[in-house]
A protein has these predicted regions:
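Bacterial N-terminal signal peptides that target proteins for export
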Residues: 1-8
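C-terminal motif of bacterial Sec signal peptides marking the signal peptidase cleavage site
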Residues: 14-19
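Bacterial lipoprotein signal-peptidase II cleavage site
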Residues: 21-29
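Short, glycine-/small- and polar/acidic-enriched structural segments
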Residues: 40-202, 208, 215-218, 242
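Short, solvent-exposed loop/beta-turn-alpha elements that line the ligand-binding surface or hinge
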Residues: 77-93, 243-249, 264, 325-339
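Pocket-lining segment of extracytoplasmic ligand-binding domains
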Residues: 129-130, 204-208, 212-303
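Secondary-structure end/capping motifs
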Residues: 266-355
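Conserved C-terminal helix/tail region of periplasmic/extracytoplasmic solute-binding proteins
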Residues: 339-384
């Protein structure tokens, strides 16, 4: 793959030539091939146009789901275990980047809440379901989507339950553990798939209740399935799961998002930065091992309750591809979001929110309010 070094140089040429990308641009996507190690971006200066440090708030501990963001710094970043941060130069762009872990480091609050509580944060991980729900109270705009399908799942012990659908889970009355504020749970309840009296928002990411009780629990197809079957000593047996995507909640998971004013105030920054994000994602997916190893090291340096393994991280990347969770998006390039798909979700999701008495969404919200493909480079492709 062309490295970030090459990608940044090509980007600089493209910007000089005035080749701006929009979500209606038609071009033949180019497949790139990964280098053996992460290379630093070269040829694009972000000095004076992007915040320095450029801070990204993620939604959880460092893991392959966030690898493309950590990969912008590379493997030589510095860990602050107390604050859950990873900091280093954003290649040769002239600025520093900091990636912040979520979960306990932000009080288990959604990244959108932290985004608006801390003005230092420039970008945050926000799924489009949450962005729709909070489009009035905490508005954000997605500029890059790593996921084509959300890896979010509900999982259970097949020795305790036999479920083929979300209706089955609801009919069983089984307790369902989830993180408070998760938009998908509002959807499942609002659509009548689960009942409000069977769900429990006290989940903190730990395995204890799943191991000791017969519960259904949220997780990621790219993480918890492998962890429970292979790494958690108290379990190490099969789990079954269903993708939330298959319930009709077809969100773009964990999109890299900015506040609406950044589309104008930081437009020059986004025009230069977002293609580097695309290239970082392609680089990671084509050669995941260096960053998978580093992510495992970071988790161990954080020394918290969350665990990881290189086997888990390598399996995660395989699941991303095998289950079609990560792929090129609209028009055949990475990061693009389909506005028709988002609008279709809005048409289903907003009435559910209204029925639940949730009033945080913008009246008349549409895809253009919460997402844009304007900053993407259509020549940067995974090739699958």
């Amino acid at each position: 793959m062309r490295s970030l070094r090459t990608a940044a140089l090509l980007l600089a040429i493209a910007l000089v030539a005035g080749a701006c990308t929009t979500d209606t641009t038609e071009t033949t996507p180019a497949t790139t091939a990964a280098p053996a190690t992460t290379a630093a971006p070269e040829g694009t200066s972000l000095v004076g146009i992007c915040p320095d440090p450029l801070i990204v708030q993620t939604d959880w501990f460092p893991q392959p789901e966030h690898a493309y963001t950590y990969n912008l710094i590379g493997t030589e970043g510095v860990v602050d275990a107390e604050n859950g941060t990873y900091t280093g130069p954003l290649g040769d762009t002239g600025i520093t980047m900091q990636v912040r872990a979520g979960g306990p480091y932000i009080g288990f609050s959604p990244p959108t809440s932290q985004f608006y509580a801390d003005n230092e944060i420039f970008m945050a991980y926000v799924d489009t379901g949450t962005a729709i729900r909070d489009s009035q109270s905490l508005p954000v705009v997605a500029v890059f989507a790593f996921w084509e399908k959300s890896p979010q799942i509900l999982m259970w012990d097949p020795a305790a339950y036999s479920f083929d659908s979300f209706d089955d889970i609801g009919a069983s009355g089984a307790p369902v553990l989830y993180f408070e504020g998760s938009a998908f749970m509002d959807f499942l309840i609002g659509r009548g798939l689960l009942s409000a009296d069977q769900v429990d928002a006290s989940y903190d990411g730990g395995p204890s209740r799943f191991v000791t009780e017969s519960v259904v629990q949220q997780g990621f197809a790219t993480n918890e399935v492998y962890r429970y079957e292979n790494d958690i000593a108290e379990w190490k047996k099969p789990v079954d799961s269903l993708l939330i995507h298959d319930a009709g909640f077809e969100i773009y998971e964990g999109t890299l998002s900015v506040k609406p004013q950044s589309l104008t105030d930081r437009r020059e920054c986004l025009e230069a930065l977002v293609p580097l994000v695309q290239q970082s994602a392609v680089e990671y997916m084509n050669n995941p091992e260096p960053m998978n190893v580093r992510l495992d090291e970071i988790v161990k340096e954080l020394d918290s309750f969350w665990t990881s393994s290189i086997g888990l991280h390598n399996a995660a990347t395989e699941v991303m591809i095998d289950r079609g969770l990560v792929s090129d998006g609209l028009d055949g390039f990475i990061g693009a979001m389909d506005p028709d798909r988002i609008n279709s979700l809005i048409d289903v999701w907003v009435p559910v929110l209204a029925d639940l008495g949730i009033e945080s969404f913008k009246e008349g919200v549409r895809a253009a309010d919460i997402s844009t493909n304007d900053f993407l480079d259509p020549s940067i492709s995974l090739g699958f």
